Structures are given as structure tokens and as C-alpha cells.
Amino acid sequence: MFDAAPIKKVSVVIPVYNEQESLPELIRRTTTACESLSKAWEILLIDDGSSDSSAELMVKASQEADSHIISILLNRNYGQHAAIMAGFSHVSGDLIITLDADLQNPPEEIPRLVAKADEGFDVVGTVRQNRQDSLFRKSASKIINLLIQRTTGKAMGDYGCMLRAYRRPIIDTMLRCHERSTFIPILANIFARRATEIPVHHAEREFGDSKYSFMRLINLMYDLVTCLTTTPLRLLSLLGSVIAIGGFSLSVLLIVLRLALGPQWAAEGVFMLFAVLFTFIGAQFIGMGLLGEYIGRIYNDVRARPRYFVQQVIYPESTPFTEESHQ
């Protein structure tokens, strides 16, 4: 029997970026799901610098009578995980659930996550069944999940699904972390004592397009590699050693062949020498790029700039105000 504290209030955190078409339905379905809980609840919508009317719709929802919606407006786009962290800093619940705004993960799954967390788990992840994504998105997700499992040793099936539940101590601990590159599911699992996963439905995206383009997925993979482990640096050292030994061996071989076969053979081997040279130069540039990625992240962390700036927070039945402090 787990000895976790009882859950008295649930907070649902939803980052929003240009989701004006899905937002009314999202609010309706999420509110209905939360009303079915036998606990207090709140919904936090975080506008991540949307250029459409998402922010206006959020503010209107917060100002309705008997609203449970808190709207947090960031001054520009900072990315999905930064927006979620901004929401975490304003929650008041004992259990915090994250949910995407595109309705591909049904809000109706929220009671199941709460019930599972009530069993004493610190983190409740989800695995999408019958994924309604493109082949490219599915393939990229499999690669990312495999990469995470290999580097962290945490065998969870679907790190890419943001429909997840976290107990408050996990959230508080994550808020004390100040690294710029934050991948919330992994960071939470680092601190979780008991974590589990449940299968959930996955629907097609009805409105708009995915906000994760090819380049954003590539950047995400770089983030995962460099923020999770220093193994690539060790592999780089190993690769450098192999190349150095190979280069020395090749040099000895070329000298022997030059002495055995004469200068004419050496002249005819110029192109091979250039090929070897370009191989070594390419390996050096790969290594320099990887080192630069790590150094750049160290530089960003040392500057300790805020990950986001909260422009306004609109609470239910209250007047909007501008925050002087930011995270």
C-alpha cells in the first residue's frame, strides 16, 4: 500500500498556441471532465504568444460566472515546455495534469489519471493507442522514445504524450530546476519514486496543423541528447581515439607502400589521401558542433535569464493585472 498524501484538488495545465478553433470545445470538454471528479479543481490556460484570438477567448472564459479557469498570458512565444512551467508556477492543486490544446488527447481521460494517481503514484504517464499522426510523426516519436529510454534507463513507452499527471512535490521540485532546456516528462521521472503508464485514446487533429515542424523535431532531439546525458561527449572521445589510431596506421601503411612500390604509386594515391583528409575534417566538425552545443547550453544556463515572462494573469471573477515579477 502506497503512503502518498490524499489528493484534494486537481489542477489541469494546458499550453495554448494559436488554437482559437479548438479552444471553445477544449474548455467545454475539459470542464465537463473535471466536474465529474469528486474533488476541487481548476484549469490553467497558458497563452504562449498566440497571434490569433486565443488570448481573448481565454480571458473571456476566465471572466464568466462560476468559472474555474485561470488564464496566464505570456508576452511572446517561449515554447510548449516553458509555457507549461509557467502554468506550474501558478497551480494550487495536489495533483497537476498536463494536456495539449489540440484535443488529440481527449480531456475525458482526466478522471482515469486521477484515479491512478490516487493509488499512490508520483507520476502517471500515458501511452497513445491507435495514434492518429502522420508516418513521419510516428517515426520521429519512436526514435525519440528509444533515445530517451537508452539514455535515462527509464523504460516508459510514450514520452511524447503530454497527457500526464504529477503530484505536487514533483512539480515543486521541477520548479527549483533552472536549466533552460526542460523536457518535463523526463525531468519528472528523475524525481519520481513511483511512476506508471496507462493507455489512452488518441484522436485526429480537427483544427489547424501540428506546431511541431521538421526543424522543431530536430531541435527537440538536440535538446534531449544534450540535456539528458554527457554520453555523446564520451563517444566523441572514443571516436577521436579510433580516428587517431586509424590515421596513424594508415600513415605507416602508406610509408611502407611508398618504399615498396616506389614514388609512382604514391602519386596515384593522392585522391585517396584527400578522401582520408576530408573524412578526418568531417569528424572534427561533427565533434566541434557537438561541443559547441554543450557550451552554448552552459552559456545560457550561466546567464540565468528567465525562461518566460508572464505578462498577465486573469483569475476567475477578478480584474486582470500585470505581474511585476516573472519566473
From Swiss-Prot:
The enzyme's E.C. designation: 2.4.2.53
Topology, Cytoplasmic side: 1-235, 291-327
Keywords: Antibiotic resistance, Cell inner membrane, Cell membrane, Glycosyltransferase, Lipid A biosynthesis, Lipid biosynthesis, Lipid metabolism, Lipopolysaccharide biosynthesis, Membrane, Transferase, Transmembrane, Transmembrane helix
Recorded GO MF terms: phosphotransferase activity, for other substituted phosphate groups; undecaprenyl-phosphate 4-deoxy-4-formamido-L-arabinose transferase activity
Membrane topology qualifier: Multi-pass membrane protein
Subcellular localization, as worded in the UniProt entry: Cell inner membrane
Chief place of localization: membrane
Pathway membership: Glycolipid biosynthesis; 4-amino-4-deoxy-alpha-L-arabinose undecaprenyl phosphate biosynthesis; 4-amino-4-deoxy-alpha-L-arabinose undecaprenyl phosphate from UDP-4-deoxy-4-formamido-beta-L-arabinose and undecaprenyl phosphate: step 1/2; Bacterial outer membrane biogenesis; lipopolysaccharide biosynthesis
Catalytic activity: UDP-4-deoxy-4-formamido-beta-L-arabinose + di-trans,octa-cis-undecaprenyl phosphate = 4-deoxy-4-formamido-alpha-L-arabinopyranosyl di-trans,octa-cis-undecaprenyl phosphate + UDP
Transmembrane regions: 236-256, 270-290
A Gene Ontology cellular-component term: plasma membrane
Topological domains, Periplasmic: 257-269
InterPro entries named in the record: ArnC_tfrase (IPR022857), Glyco_trans_2-like (IPR001173), Glycosyltransferase_2 (IPR050256), Nucleotide-diphossugar_trans (IPR029044)
Listed Pfam families: Glycos_transf_2 (PF00535)
A GO biological-process term: lipopolysaccharide biosynthetic process
Family: Belongs to the glycosyltransferase 2 family.
NCBIfam families from the UniProt entry: PRK10714.1
Cited function: Catalyzes the transfer of 4-deoxy-4-formamido-L-arabinose from UDP to undecaprenyl phosphate. The modified arabinose is attached to lipid A and is required for resistance to polymyxin and cationic antimicrobial peptides.
Protein name: Undecaprenyl-phosphate 4-deoxy-4-formamido-L-arabinose transferase
Name of the encoding gene: arnC
